[in-house]
From Swiss-Prot:
Gene3D superfamilies listed in its UniProt record: Acyl-CoA thioesterase, double hotdog domain (2.40.160.210)
Official protein name in the record: Uncharacterized protein Mb0510
Source species taxonomy: Bacteria, Bacillati, Actinomycetota, Actinomycetes, Mycobacteriales
Organism: Mycobacterium bovis (strain ATCC BAA-935 / AF2122/97)
UniProt xrefs under InterPro entries: ACOT8-like_C, Acyl-CoA_hotdog, Diacylglycerol_kinase_cat_dom, HotDog_dom_sf, Sec_Metab_Biosynth-Assoc, TesB_ACOT8-like_N
PANTHER family given in the database record: CHROMOSOME 23, WHOLE GENOME SHOTGUN SEQUENCE, THIOESTERASE DOMAIN-CONTAINING PROTEIN
Cysteine disulfide partners in this protein: none
Length: 291
């Protein structure tokens, strides 16, 4: 099967309710190349929901095109790879902000409910340090922890997830994107602090876009690896912010947490592009795997 990210994000419009023009229905497919273990990758579903909201907004004749600047997703159950239906409803059409509801279903059962805020992300001029050269083009304030820790490209020795890789049995995204984690960062720090997981990623065959950047906001192995809990860690809720559209090249992903409890843990991702700009931030609540 085709493993291209653009294919995974493709949507086919289905018959919608003519009496409700704000509601549109699409069909998509996330195949085995977009799975973690036997189940569909949560970040891929977030990206697909975001695309459905964006597409529904455009289909309603709204101009200019808006991007999914925020996605708040609740995960009700984990679907299998295959065909999915996305039911969208535009809740607000505004001059700067619009809002859409999206339900991703499989077999008549809702797997993800997402509220997508559509707007215009930042457009900072490129700079080596992520800032622009002209007044008004740089962030007013930025505390970007990634640029000091991670180079724009993965160093030699940081290999992609694929056959023979330590994570290949769990992460099946290698056909569709090049994911290169620093395995040593999956462990807790020697002083007992939570892990600071580092990885690089880019889609194969195409440049990274807003949707791939959103997927990267859920790309790291769970931080529970640091406490030897490496089983299934289902995400319950995830919020993602698209801060800017990524430049072509590698995306740097930094994954951290505040607390791993007995039952619940939090996990944050910061995604930075080749130019050093923050393009996505996410925070999720998930369940700690059993021992």
């Amino acid at each position: 099967m085709n493993a291209l990210f653009t294919t995974a994000m493709a949507l086919r419009p289905l018959d919608s309710d003519p009496g409700n023009p704000a509601c549109r229905v699409f069909e998509g497919e996330l195949n085995e190349h977009w799975t973690i273990g036997p189940k569909v990758h949560g970040g891929a579903m977030v990206a697909l929901c975001a695309n459905a909201a964006r597409t529904a907004y455009g289909a309603a004749g709204q101009q200019p095109m808006r991007q999914p600047v925020a996605v708040s997703a609740s995960f009700l159950w984990a679907p299998d790879p295959g065909t999915m239906r996305l039911v969208t409803s535009i809740r607000k059409r505004g001059r700067r902000i619009s809002v859409a509801d999206v339900e991703l279903t499989q077999g008549g059962r809702t797997a993800v409910h997402a509220v997508v805020t559509l707007g215009e992300p930042e457009h900072f001029l490129p700079g080596v340090d992520g800032s622009g050269g002209a007044s008004g083009t740089a962030p007013l304030l930025s505390a970007n922890p990634v640029v000091e820790l991670m180079a724009p490209e993965p160093p030699e020795g940081v290999v992609p997830i694929g056959p023979g890789h330590q994570l290949a049995g769990l992460v099946h995204l290698g056909e569709g994107c090049d994911v290169r984690p620093v395995l040593s960062t999956l462990r807790s720090a020697t002083d007992g602090r939570p892990p600071v997981i580092q990885l690089w990623a880019r889609p194969r065959g195409v440049a990274p876009d807003a949707l791939f950047a959103l997927l990267c906001g859920d790309l790291s192995a769970p931080v529970t690896f640091a406490v030897d809990r490496t089983g299934w860690a289902p995400t319950v809720a995830l919020t993602a912010y698209l801060r800017a559209l990524p430049a072509d090249g590698w995306l740097r992903v930094l994954c951290t947490c505040v607390e791993i409890g007995q039952d619940w843990f939090d996990e944050d991702h910061i995604v930075v592009d080749r130019l050093g700009r923050i393009v996505v931030q996410t925070r999720q609540l998930a369940m700690v795997p059993a021992q």
